[in-house]
């Protein structure tokens, strides 16, 4: 996700014939926005509902993806780390549910949101360095909207 958004902002800057410094800034803005977006997506995988997500809660874990909230919890909770290491695709659903509930009840969700916010802040700082105009205000608006994303 981060790479896709990064490439999009970079290619947009190149095709609009921006100078090298603006291309570099827009590339980094895309990277930071993409990282923030992906982390929020990882958080929503635990905090949202199946109806809102359009997929089962915890589907990243069910599919074997170790996301930031999981990594953060593994780092501070050895029992949880062991549970994750023992999970297999054919593990019983209740084993996955246990891990999902541990994440939901932990502060790893808030920690991941804080990391996402840091990336968003870096993007906003770089956006503030861009020349004033309609493209800048659109990018600023989009970035702020991403920070309040809940689906």
What are these regions (language model features)?
Residues 1-151:
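All-alpha prenyltransferase/terpene-synthase fold signal
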